[in-house]
Amino acid sequence: LWERLGQDLTLQDLMQQCRFEVLATTKLPMAIDFLNSELKHTGVLAPGMRRLSHYFTAYQAFLVEQAEEDRGRFDFRTALLVLQSEANYKASSAFDRQGLFFFQFEALCRHRLKYDAGLKSMSQDPAYDVAWQEWLLIVQKQLGLVDLADLIYGRSEEFVTYRKRHLGPDARPEYPILFGEREGKIAFANRRKEPLYLFAAMQRHLGYPPVPKREIVDQTLELIPQMQRRLERLEARMKFMEEEQRQGIDITKFFGRGGPPMVDLGENT
């Protein structure tokens, strides 16, 4: 769908084409028909995706909903790229919950989406277990009051080692541990810093796919043809002005090959 957005076709027509190209042995064509009907009646896809919860997660529906907002800067093409990268990562052998969390949360940060609704939709993703879902709701409430790196460090093996070193070997974590020792060290090193540095370090360490960014169209290649057309119009206007100052404008050259049109003045009887 993303590859065909630039073919000057409506989204309804593209959905109809995709419906005939998927495997007929599955029920996916029925889901595409349902989304196409929702698109024709309401003009948006997100409500239909929420109703098809067995095909789309709440986070995926949230991304499409943000892309369909009129005042948002998150365009639909970028949303499809994010959905594609997330689906490929979930299907790969390198998938883990830590990488999925950083990928989804980095998408919220880079595209300036709503953190509250975004984290809530992340907590409803079936890829996370109960411990992850509870922690995501905690992050939703504490984000902005507590640094993200501190929230990650508090659920890491590095923090458990720190507690045992200062409180004794019998010190046990009070909450489920979600991150390893290396992730805790990276989070501790990036405290009070720009979150993008934390994401870059985690992306290199965990190997999750980079978050697609908004494509910036280079308009410099279109400037020269535009300037050329403007110069041609200015040149034509200058010629008209010169002819008018000399002897008037000769309008006969604008006539067709048949000569000037004949005007029937009629006769008074």
PLM region spans:
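Catalytic metal-binding core of the metallo-beta-lactamase
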Residues: L1-T269
